[in-house]
Structures are given as structure tokens and as C-alpha cells.
């Protein structure tokens, strides 16, 4: 019984500490519908499993509580592997030659901003804040 309580306490404690970005893996249409219903923008992460900068962003930026809270309040976030169909199509349409690539859309599908490459959390957040502020000024 003590072992079970310890394991539950440990599991709950580590889960609470990880307020990271919640990424959807649904279709782009489903993600857009979620954003419409929730009144949020759409954030898309185009990555590849073999990409060191992509993995660095996952470990050092998207895992942070402050980044997770900021993004979850403002975006429905989705991620697509550029080695698979949806990711490849998005990269072809909106991309450059480099990943990671981050795209921000409004609920009408208009591209509001693009962030290319890895960055530390503060720089990444500054870039997102700029995109969000520009969108707010349009309204």
C-alpha cells in the first residue's frame, strides 16, 4: 500500500510540473474547427524526427510551463512531421528549405506569421507575442 501511494504521489507530482504545450495531431481542418470553437489562433509546428533543432525546441522550449501556458491560452497547436503527407504538403505550400518551421494562422486560414529555425524560449516567445500583437491591432 505504501508503495502504491508513493507511486501515485510521484506520478501526480511529475504530471503537475509538466505544463507543456499541448500539440494536436488531427487534420488541419479539425484543428481549424477547434480554433474557431475556442476563439484561438492556429499554431503549426513543422518538424522532422531526425532534426536536431526540432528536438531541441521540444526539450527546451515547448516543455516549459510558461511557454505552455502562453500558447495554450492563445493557440490551438498542432504538429506535423515533414516526412509525412500533411507536413510535406504544408512545407511545400508555406515553407522554406529549413525546419523547424512554425506557422500562425487566423481561423480564416490567413497566414499571420512564420518563425523559422530554433531559438531560446525568450526569443521564441517574443516572436509569438509580436505575431499576436499584430493580429490584435487588425481587429
Language-model regions, residue ranges each:
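Hydrophobic beta-strand anchors of alpha/beta hydrolase catalytic cores
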Residues: 43-44, 77, 102
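Non-catalytic, surface beta->alpha helical segment in thiol-disulfide oxidoreductase systems
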Residues: 97-137
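Sec/Tat signal peptide C-region and signal peptidase I cleavage site
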Residues: 14-19
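Short pre-active-site segment immediately N-terminal to redox-active cysteine/selenocysteine motifs
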Residues: 39-42, 46-50, 98
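Thiol-based oxidoreductase modules, predominantly thioredoxin-like and allied folds used
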Residues: 22-26, 62-86
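A short beta-strand-turn-helix
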Residues: 23-41, 71
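Conserved redox-active cysteine motifs that mediate thiol-disulfide chemistry
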Residues: 46-62
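Sec-dependent N-terminal signal peptides
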Residues: 4-13
Amino acid at each position: 500500500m505504501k508503495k502504491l501511494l508513493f507511486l501515485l504521489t510521484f506520478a501526480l507530482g511529475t504530471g503537475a510540473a509538466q505544463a507543456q504545450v499541448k500539440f494536436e495531431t488531427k487534420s488541419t481542418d479539425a484543428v481549424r474547427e477547434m480554433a474557431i470553437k475556442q476563439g484561438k489562433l492556429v499554431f503549426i509546428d513543422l518538424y522532422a524526427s531526425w532534426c536536431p533543432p526540432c528536438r531541441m525546441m521540444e526539450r527546451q522550449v515547448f516543455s516549459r510551463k510558461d511557454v505552455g501556458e502562453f500558447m495554450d491560452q492563445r493557440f490551438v497547436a498542432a504538429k506535423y512531421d515533414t516526412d509525412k503527407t500533411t507536413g510535406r504538403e504544408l512545407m511545400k505550400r508555406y515553407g522554406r528549405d529549413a525546419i523547424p518551421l512554425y506557422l500562425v494562422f487566423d481561423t480564416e486560414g490567413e497566414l499571420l506569421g512564420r518563425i523559422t529555425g530554433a531559438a531560446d524560449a525568450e526569443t521564441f516567445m517574443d516572436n509569438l507575442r509580436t505575431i499576436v500583437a499584430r493580429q490584435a491591432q487588425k481587429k
